[in-house]
UniProtKB/Swiss-Prot annotation:
It is a multi-pass membrane protein. Interacts with CHS3. The chain crosses the membrane at residues 51-71, 86-106, 114-134, 156-176, 194-214, 218-238, 251-271. It comes from Debaryomyces hansenii (strain ATCC 36239 / CBS 767 / BCRC 21394 / JCM 1990 / NBRC 0083 / IGC 2968) (Yeast). Belongs to the CHS7 family. This is Chitin synthase export chaperone. It holds the Pfam family Chs7. It is found in: Endoplasmic reticulum membrane. One of its GO terms (molecular function) is unfolded protein binding. The lineage of its organism: Eukaryota, Fungi, Dikarya, Ascomycota, Saccharomycotina. GO terms for cellular component: endoplasmic reticulum membrane. GO terms for biological process: cell wall organization; protein folding; protein transport.
């Protein structure tokens, strides 16, 4: 595999972007798209062809889990970084919805809109990466959480990173520039894969430093390690064993099924870690629930955390 091209990856797993990038092999039968050796079969439901049906169930299950997580985060009124974490989970919901669109054929790979939806998916995935890093740094309390300045900074950072990834991906897919076309994918590979991997590595390192040097308990370290395990396992199953899984499952599922499931478990571990390192003033929360208070402000707001306490 040459650095920056998707030939080897797309021959193993049926990523959505594989339908809109070109093979560096000039003798390929297709001018656009790289067909994997094995991919999950489509299913016809109500005269509608649905791709990746197993992956669709994982996405729907993930949406239900995310709604439960958001409900629990919203109920933890006084926890550190509550608003910023909510923003992260909202991004994940948007990412799952975009994945449903491109994975299940809501926008068919042959349509003109498909490249735009794939670019949106990559942009949302990148925005989620930079968002979780922001939340990780927020735990060190370098700035006030939940403030207007903090939230607008988070929104601007995520939007800018989304735009960068979206534009690079779209220009690559559409071949609008001679330096970036469907066969010259190095820039997209570096930005979408390499830089985002570095961002996630920084997040993990920062949280390990936080647990080791700032917390009284090492139990949250278990949530971090489990999250890393699920994430790495998902990447390995998606990019290395997708073909074996597909053949073993008679084309009903492939590596994307397990990759998506592992990503959901990773998000659950991120929530669990945040839940373990933050505490809530129970008396304050219950009192406000009884009185129907939905928003707090001013200096009298109580916030609790196990960090630097």
């Amino acid at each position: 595999m040459a650095f920056g091209n998707f030939d080897t990856i797309c021959n193993i797993t049926s990523l959505p972007l594989c339908s809109v990038v070109g093979s560096v092999n000039e003798t390929s039968y297709f001018t656009r798209g790289i067909v994997p050796d094995c991919y999950a079969r489509s299913v016809e439901l109500a005269n509608t062809m649905v791709f990746q049906i197993g992956n669709a169930f994982v996405h729907f299950g993930g949406l239900i889990i995310l709604l439960i997580i958001i409900f629990n985060v919203r109920a933890k009124y006084t926890a550190i970084g509550r608003t910023e974490m909510l923003f992260f989970f909202y991004l994940i919901i948007c990412l799952i919805v975009s994945s449903l669109v491109v994975d299940c054929g809501v926008s068919p790979p042959s349509s003109g809109s498909y490249a735009y939806f794939v670019a949106v998916q990559l942009g949302l995935a990148s925005a989620s990466c930079i968002c979780i890093l922001y939340n990780g740094l927020l735990c060190f309390q370098f700035w006030e959480d939940g403030s207007r300045k903090s939230m607008w900074s988070l929104r601007v950072i995520c939007f800018c990173w989304f735009v960068v990834n979206f534009i690079v991906a779209l220009v690559t897919f559409k071949s609008w520039d001679s330096a970036l076309d469907s066969r010259k994918t190095m820039a997209m590979f570096v930005i979408t894969y390499l830089i985002n991997a570095i961002i996630l590595a920084f997040y993990v390192i920062s949280q390990i430093v936080l647990v080791v040097f700032a917390l009284d308990s090492y139990w949250p370290l278990g949530a971090i390690l489990l999250g890393v395990f699920f994430f790495v396992a998902g990447q390995v199953l998606t990019y290395e064993f997708s073909d074996d899984i597909c053949r073993g499952a008679s084309h009903y599922i492939d590596g994307l099924f397990f990759g998506s499931a592992c990503n959901i478990f990773t998000v659950m571990m991120i929530y669990k870690f945040w839940d373990m390192i933050t505490v809530d003033d129970l008396e304050f929360s219950v009192a406000n629930v009884e009185h129907g208070v939905t928003a707090f402000g001013g200096d009298d707001e109580k916030r609790g955390s196990t960090i630097f306490s």
